[in-house]
Design a protein with these regions (language model features):
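C-terminal leucine-rich, beta-strand-based interaction scaffolds used for sensing/assembly
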Residues: 16-163, 167-174, 178, 185-186
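The tetratricopeptide repeat
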Residues: 147, 185-189, 232-242, 285
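Terminal, low-structured helical/coil segments at or just beyond the last alpha-helical repeat
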Residues: 272-307
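Residue signature of alpha-solenoid helical repeat architecture, marking inter-repeat boundaries
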Residues: 141-142, 182, 230, 234
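Structural register within alpha-helical repeat arrays
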Residues: 109-118, 150-151, 191, 198, ...
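Amphipathic alpha-helical "lid/sensor" segments that cap RecA-like P-loop NTPase cores
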Residues: 1-21
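Alpha-helical repeat scaffolds
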Residues: 85-88, 123-138, 162-174, 203-226, ...
Length: 307
């Protein structure tokens, strides 16, 4: 009915406005299967305060207001929003080949960080998992490394580590198919986070040093990428903030020889971070980098290893 059509239009308009998807009226007609979109919007007097329809575009007047409304579940339930997004993803799956715009929309709609942003980082575990489960068999998703990496990240965020491990395995398998020249630096960083957080969550001291050594190796194996992709160089420091919790939980209680292995890697990360900071102005240094520096200083100070 007309009210249902209006709600679907507004949900897509809000998501598109928040994520800047660049969809026009024709895209709305195709993706929502509603041909009289302009009339549906204009027939509702209150819509004029929220969205504009002009020059073939549907514009949200304020992405901030759109975000506030998306977070109010009494207006749009999470279930309703995800149902609209699932229907749109199914439509896009038949349209994205040959369309960079639609391909980009699909990338946005499976990005963990973007979806979390739409919902104000209020993640309901069952709803997010249901969403990814509903779209994982789409042609765009099932062989898509980015999709499985994002699904794994969602599972880490929701502390579903067994699932995360399976989906990282799928992502690495797809990365391997791209050949030895493909760099999996992004997956490596997220997988390192998975290794550390999984070990911390279950408080498993047995094997914890081996896990730490592997996580540290993954964070540091892509030094050439650190140089080329300057915008992504902070990723490993964001993950390495967990070294402090790892020290408090496990490493502070290690035998001296094992503790030395741990501390040498902390020194290596600290040296790398200081070198990284030298290339930045003070206002360019991200908060997570500062937090990592503080965490590493805490560890090295505690063991009198800070020169």
């Amino acid at each position: 009915n007309a009210n249902d059509d209006l709600r679907r239009i507004l949900i897509l308009a809000f998501v598109s406005g928040i994520l800047e998807l660049g969809l026009d009226v024709n895209d709305y007609k195709i993706l929502l299967d509603i041909q009289d979109i302009e009339r549906v919007i204009r027939r509702n007097k209150n819509c004029g305060d929220i969205v504009d329809v002009k020059r073939g575009n549907i514009m949200v007047k304020s992405s901030i207001i759109a975000k506030e409304l998306m977070m109010k579940t009494e207006i749009f339930s999470t279930n309703e929003v995800f149902n609209v997004l699932i229907a749109i993803m199914n439509k896009l799956d038949n349209l994205y080949l040959g369309s960079d715009k639609y391909k980009n929309v699909m990338i946005n709609l499976v990005s963990c960080s973007y979806l979390s942003y739409v919902f104000g980082y209020q993640m309901e575990s069952n709803k997010f998992i249901e969403y990814y489960e509903n779209v994982k068999e789409l042609n765009f998703c099932k062989k898509n490394l980015f999709f499985w990496e994002q699904y794994a990240i969602v599972c880490i965020n929701l502390k579903q580590f067994d699932r995360a491990g399976r989906y990282f395995k799928t992502a690495y398998s797809l990365a391997k198919q791209r050949g030895h020249l493909f760099s999996a630096y992004q997956i490596d960083n997220h997988y390192a986070r998975y290794l550390l957080e999984n070990q911390l969550y279950y408080r498993k001291k047995e094997g914890s040093l081996d896990v730490f050594v592997e996580a540290h190796r993954l964070l540091n194996k892509n030094s050439e990428i650190d140089i080329i992709k300057k915008n992504s160089r902070y990723y490993k420091y964001r993950v390495a903030r967990a070294y402090k919790d790892y020290y408090d939980t496990f490493a502070s209680k290690y035998e001296e020889s094992d503790k030395d292995i741990f501390l040498k890697r902390c020194e290596e990360m600290y040296s790398s971070l200081i070198q990284y900071k030298r290339g930045l102005d003070n206002d360019e240094i991200r908060r997570d980098v500062r937090e990592c520096e503080s965490a590493l200083k805490y560890i090295l100070d505690s063991e009198n290893r800070l020169s």
